[in-house]
Regions:
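Active-site-adjacent "subsite" loops/lids of carbohydrate-active enzymes
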Residues: 5-30, 86, 96-97, 102-156
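Active-site clefts of carbohydrate-active enzymes
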Residues: 8, 218-237, 275-308
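The substrate-binding groove and active-site-proximal loops of carbohydrate-active enzymes
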Residues: 11-26, 63-78, 129-144, 189-200, ...
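Polysaccharide-binding and catalytic clefts of secreted carbohydrate-active enzymes
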Residues: 38, 44-45, 52, 82, ...
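Aromatic-lined carbohydrate-binding/catalytic grooves of carbohydrate-active enzymes
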Residues: 42-76
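Substrate-binding cleft of secreted/luminal carbohydrate-active enzymes
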Residues: 248-271, 283-358
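Pro/Thr/Ser/Gly-rich low-complexity, intrinsically disordered linker/stalk tracts
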Residues: 338-386, 435-458
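Beta-strand-rich modules
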Residues: 418-439
Length: 458
């Protein structure tokens, strides 16, 4: 996985202006298309689009108001989540709805939202800490609310994933004012800390089950803190288990998550030991390292580029994916983008798949044809039922579809032809469904070859 967070909170990555007049809507859409074009050009295959910020959303919802930064809380004239999903899929990029879970706004934000705020509508569900409002994870009604909120997104939109943010207790959690909730819904057999951990895990479980009930191919993930717990010789006071009652390893191991993206915005001894801990204690392919490319900015740490470069190199060697926080920082650091294009992401990559519960594979995209014309190879094939994307392989050597360096294109389901400026001797194509299950391949080696004569274990 090669992912980027597109942050909408405060319009940090998008939008640059709210919708006031009709032309603003088209400006917002044009900005999103520019962002996605750039991400496609550097090899990104997954977008985490921030669809819910603090009690406000970027889609049509029966539960929460339109975001002020989008359109001053009014209907903007289009649906940004539907738009970004469609544009991502045109580029064969996965779009995951990034949802902030428990924070619902500062005092100022809640006051500005007025009667439409979560706090005004459900005051008994909310707690205040240090001038910020939060849904109380210990209140059973909050679990039902978040499950319904996520269910609405999955039901209405063609998302590829649900990405949960802030699915934990707040910083300075020991001061979180939930003693009344603990007395009402807690258990004498559990400590406050264990009760809180169970609250978070229960909400994660409810969301996961709701997503899979509605659309089992939709992936469920979250961005936990970057360090699970202190390691011997490497203390980490601000960690999942020691600070915020968050147990993402358990979510993975018990089948309540499809992958996690720890926010590993650290370096040296605060990064590498914890990366190895995540990778060695979680199922293979289920950890995506969140990389803090914002740390390259002078005001955010002024890291030398070599720090991020080493982290990318290490995660690639370990088979761990990368997610970059956030788009604007990736956009402004030209050297990083150049390295992605010329070195790290020279070849397209396939996002991790899911187990297909119906054990069905897509049809084969038959009639693969390659025609050379003026130094360009024009390639075409027939549509395949069940395809969500097509994966094209090409090489001048023997085809080996078990390695990624022969992938030359990943194309959306409505595209059945493409052109390559570099000619190859051998080609193969497969259809891939929403679970990542691949069809039988079709080959071209100067003439079409029947797939069962060259069966490859994928």
């Amino acid at each position: 996985m090669r992912a980027v967070w597109i942050t909408t909170n405060w319009g940090l990555d998008w939008p640059s202006r709210p919708v006031k007049v009709l032309s603003d809507r088209y400006i917002q859409q044009k900005e999103l298309c520019y962002i996605l074009d750039e991400l496609q050009s550097v090899g990104i295959n997954t977008v985490f689009f921030q669809a819910r910020i603090r009690g406000e959303v970027f889609y049509s919802s029966r539960y929460e108001p339109w975001a002020a930064v989008l359109s001053h809380g009014q209907e903007p004239g289009y649906d940004p989540l539907a738009f970004v999903i469609e544009e991502c899929h045109k580029r064969a990029i996965e779009c995951h709805a990034w949802l902030v879970t428990f924070p619902v706004g500062s005092n100022r934000q809640v006051k500005k939202q007025g009667r439409s705020s979560v706090v005004a509508r459900h005051r008994s569900w909310c707690k205040q800490l240090s001038g910020e409002w939060f849904l109380d994870p210990g209140n059973p009604a909050v679990k039902d609310y978040l499950r319904a909120l996520v269910g609405e997104v999955v039901s209405k939109y063609d998302v590829d994933g649900i990405h949960l943010d802030y699915v934990r207790y707040p910083d300075n959690a020991m001061k979180f004012p939930d003693s009344d909730s603990f007395r009402k819904w807690g258990s004498r057999s559990k400590s406050l800390f264990r009760w809180r951990e169970d609250n978070i895990t229960g909400i994660v479980t409810a969301i996961y089950e709701e997503v899979k009930r509605l659309k089992p191919w939709v992936k469920v993930s979250s961005s936990p803190l970057g360090r699970y717990a202190s390691l011997e010789g490497f203390p980490a006071e601000w960690s999942c288990m020691e600070a915020v009652s968050q147990n993402p390893k358990d979510w993975l191991q018990s089948g309540r998550h499809d992958f996690i993206v720890p926010m590993m915005y650290f370096r040296e001894e605060n990064y590498y030991p914890f990366l190895y801990d995540w990778a060695n204690s979680c199922p293979p392919g289920k950890v995506i390292s969140g990389l803090g490319v914002y740390r390259l900015d002078k005001s955010e740490g002024n890291w030398p580029f070599i720090e991020i470069k080493r982290q990318i190199e290490t995660t690639r060697k370990m088979g761990v994916g990368q997610a970059y926080f956030r788009y604007e920082n990736l956009h402004t650091h030209t050297i990083l983008r150049q390295w992605l294009v010329s070195c790290f992401y020279r070849y397209p990559a396939l996002t991790p798949g899911l187990k297909n519960p119906i054990s069905q594979i897509p049809d084969t995209p038959n009639n693969l044809r390659v025609e050379a014309q003026g130094g360009v190879s024009n390639i075409s094939w027939s549509p395949a039922d069940g395809a969500f994307t097509y994966v094209l392989y090409a090489t001048n050597d023997s085809l080996d579809m078990n390695t990624g360096d022969q992938i030359v294109a990943v194309l959306p389901k409505n595209i059945h032809s493409c052109s390559l400026s570099i000619p190859y001797r051998n080609y193969a194509i497969v259809a891939r469904d929403r679970y990542g299950t691949e069809s039988e391949p079709v080959f071209w080696t100067g003439k079409n070859v029947e797939p069962d004569k060259y069966r490859i274990t994928l």
